[in-house]
Amino acid sequence: MAKKVVAIIKLAITAGKANPAPPIGPALGQHGVNIMMFCKEYNARTADQAGLVIPVEISVYEDRSFTFILKTPPASVLIQKAAGIERGSGEPNKKKVGKITTAQLREIAQTKLPDLNANDVDAAMRIVAGTARNMGVTIVD
C-alpha cells in the first residue's frame, strides 16, 4: 500500500548550502521531518551545481518520512549567470543591463525544458527570451 502524502513543501535553496536555519528548519519542522537528514541529502545531490538556486519539492508522508524532487534553476538565475550580471534592471524597457547570445539562450532553454510548459526547444527559447526581456537583458545573434 502506498504511503499517504500529508504535505508538499516547495523551497528554493542555494545548491550545497542547505542548513537547519530559517527558512528550511521551520518549514520542515512543522511537519515533523528530520531536518538534518534532508539537509545532508540535498547538499549531496546538489554539490555539483554550487552557487545556483535549486528549487525543491518535498513530499512529506504520514510516517514523517519524505522524498524530494529537484527542479531546474530559475530562468532568471541562469540568464544572470550567462550575462555576467548581479541582478536584472529596475527599468527593463529603458535601461538594458546585459546581453546574451542566441546560443546561450538555446542552452538555457534546453536546461529549463523539463520544467517549462513547452513542447520543443523553440517554444522554450521564446519563454526564456521573454524572461530575459523583462530583466533588461538583450538577446544578440
From Swiss-Prot:
UniProt-listed PROSITE patterns: RIBOSOMAL_L11
Entry coiled-coil feature ranges: none
UniProtKB keywords: Methylation, Ribonucleoprotein, Ribosomal protein, RNA-binding, rRNA-binding
InterPro entries referenced in this protein's UniProt entry, alphabetically: Ribosomal_uL11 (IPR000911), Ribosomal_uL11_bac-typ (IPR006519), Ribosomal_uL11_C (IPR020783), Ribosomal_uL11_C_sf (IPR036769), Ribosomal_uL11_CS (IPR020785), Ribosomal_uL11_N (IPR020784), Ribosomal_uL11_N_sf (IPR036796)
Post-translational modification: One or more lysine residues are methylated.
GO BP: translation
GO molecular function, one term: large ribosomal subunit rRNA binding
Record keyword Ribosomal protein present: yes
GO cellular component: cytosolic large ribosomal subunit
UniProt-listed Pfam families: Ribosomal_L11, Ribosomal_L11_N
UniProt similarity note: Belongs to the universal ribosomal protein uL11 family.
Quaternary organization: Part of the ribosomal stalk of the 50S ribosomal subunit. Interacts with L10 and the large rRNA to form the base of the stalk. L10 forms an elongated spine to which L12 dimers bind in a sequential fashion forming a multimeric L10(L12)X complex.
Task performed by this protein: Forms part of the ribosomal stalk which helps the ribosome interact with GTP-bound translation factors.
Protein name stated in the entry: Large ribosomal subunit protein uL11
Organism this protein belongs to: Cyanothece sp. (strain PCC 7425 / ATCC 29141)
Source species taxonomy: Bacteria, Bacillati, Cyanobacteriota, Cyanophyceae, Gomontiellales
